[in-house]
């Protein structure tokens, strides 16, 4: 190894060593609402004005903003003539970190009890969920504050961003759909967005009784309680979004069989919205995030995972689906159409 290669390798190692600092700084910026402030400003904002808005001393905030700018989370701009203050503006990345975008999801990953804290050597040796074993409890469900605020906000923003991508990049796929069941649809936000975009659809949100009991009425959406392991309401199209990555292959096959039973044999369709891991580990700009999500699922579920094309083909074939098509929706997830 030449000196240049060795220096590059050491630089990469240093960057990995400070990886948690990057997560912590971005998490802190979101908590201070810096991405939202820059977005609402509509143009460059001075360091002194930003300091007043977030309540952080200028000397400290300057160092945070310098770090964020280096990583593309803000942009340092030229100061107006006669001014010596620093000025910063939003970037495409900072817009993606606002509270109406992926900000809440990033907060979950950076939380003290979040998934990123769950990956340890000792935890990986466990036969159970590595993260739950390491923390001694299930952080996603046993802490009411964590569950009701951090976790739920993260899941909501993730669903909103992905549903918007589905509407924008797969809109034609909803033409002619009379009825659609969202299996594991929670409180119906995704289905509500779809029905609003495609008002001819009769939406059915299907989830466990305790979830349905808390759901508020939504125009065009009917709530039905039940278990996807037992049966699924009949419809033209069944949708599974962020569901199958929680379960083992055998459990997924059972769920898929129930979905197949609920759609017409000749015209029915199953829509799966989940990540697909590229076989060779490369892929598009979302490849690294998909691998990170896969490790997260290993930490917080018993046998959940993100699947490769081959693994998706296996569970779909075993469940009796004759063919499937993968649609790129320009998101972390893909949309898989499966036909009985």
Swiss-Prot record:
Originating gene: FOMT1
UniProt catalytic activity: (2S)-naringenin + S-adenosyl-L-methionine = (2S)-sakuranetin + S-adenosyl-L-homocysteine + H(+); scutellarein + S-adenosyl-L-methionine = scutellarein 7-methyl ether + S-adenosyl-L-homocysteine; apigenin + S-adenosyl-L-methionine = genkwanin + S-adenosyl-L-homocysteine + H(+); luteolin + S-adenosyl-L-methionine = luteolin 7-methyl ether + S-adenosyl-L-homocysteine + H(+)
Species of origin: Ocimum basilicum (Sweet basil)
GO biological process, any: methylation
Active site per database record: 245 (proton acceptor)
Keyword Calcium carried by entry: no
Residue numbers binding S-adenosyl-L-methionine: 207
Official protein name in the record: Flavonoid 7-O-methyltransferase 1
Tissues showing expression: Expressed in leaves.
Keywords assigned: Methyltransferase, S-adenosyl-L-methionine, Transferase
Domain of life: Eukaryota
Practical uses of the protein: Nevadensin is a selective inhibitor of human carboxylesterase 1 (hCE-1), a key enzyme responsible for the hydrolysis of a wide range of endogenous and xenobiotic esters.
EC number(s) stated in the UniProt entry for this protein: 2.1.1.-, 2.1.1.232
Molecular-function annotations in GO: O-methyltransferase activity; protein dimerization activity
PROSITE patterns per record: SAM_OMT_II (PS51683)
Protein's pathway: Flavonoid metabolism
Coiled coil: none
Quaternary structure note: Homodimer.
Cited function: Flavonoid 7-O-methyltransferase involved in the biosynthesis of polymethoxylated flavonoids natural products such as nevadensin and salvigenin, aroma compounds which contribute to the flavor of sweet basil, and exhibit pharmacological activities such as anti-allergic, anti-oxidant, antibacterial, anti-proliferative, and anti-inflammatory effects.
InterPro entries, A to Z: COMT-like, O_MeTrfase_dom, Plant_O-MeTrfase_dimerisation, SAM-dependent_MTases_sf, WH-like_DNA-bd_sf, WH_DNA-bd_sf
